[in-house]
Amino acid sequence: MNAQTERLSLRGSAGVLEALRDAPVLVEGVPPRGVAVIAHPHPLFGGTMDNKVVQTLARSFVQCGWVAVRFNFRGVGASEGAYDEGRGETEDYLTVVTQLAQAGPLALAGFSFGSFVTAHALQTLWSQRTIEKIVLVGTATSRFEVAQLPAEAHERTLVVHGEQDDTVPLADVMTWARPQSLPVTVVPGGGHFFHGQLPLLKSLVVRHLSSTAT
């Protein structure tokens, strides 16, 4: 993805966690804006950190000056352990934050099952850290009980969903978002994986990351 990509092995509660860290190319002396941690879709349905939507999210953050960290949940790729229905995966997410984003600006992002995990990680992190940006794509509200977001987080949050998502129907996401008065950006004609619309998805994310709402 980038000339400054590192492959990392972290120690999680279930063993080794495999991760990739993509760093932006910046003018000398200019620090990154912060660290973004990005979670992949469902491990039992082929989800990995190399998923195209996850890569698109990483590229978006890197373009905007963030260090982007992708990782494989337990039991995926070289990550040890086994699928744990979101509980252990949330631990994995928090482990990555603790080890690779100990201080400084932090952004959270996820796709599908990864958005479910991200929302639950946010519940733990919100009172501990300043979360500057949150990006949830194809949020798996029809398959999991996705945590509501703190009201104070809404201005920092981008929720994107495809109009014709046949994996997680748009109506289910609206049912989750409505009680929170949480805006949802709908991609017309978009499916769950945004085939043919990844450039549009990237532009939406970049625009959100470039906004000053914090």
Task: Walk through the language-model features, giving the residues of each.
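Serine-hydrolase catalytic machinery in alpha/beta-hydrolase-like enzymes
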Residues: 10, 16-103
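Conserved loop-alpha-helix segment in the C-terminal half of the alpha/beta-hydrolase fold
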Residues: 163-182
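Short beta-strand/loop motif that positions the catalytic acidic residue
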Residues: 153-154, 158-161, 165
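Catalytic histidine-centered segment of alpha/beta-hydrolase-like enzymes
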Residues: 190-202
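Gly/Ala-rich beta-loop-alpha elbow adjacent to hydrolase catalytic centers
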Residues: 110-118
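Acidic catalytic loop of the alpha/beta-hydrolase fold
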Residues: 142-143, 163-168, 192-193
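Short beta-strand immediately N-terminal to the catalytic nucleophile in serine-hydrolase-like folds
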Residues: 108-110, 137
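Active-site nucleophile loop of the alpha/beta-hydrolase fold
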Residues: 41-42, 136-144, 162
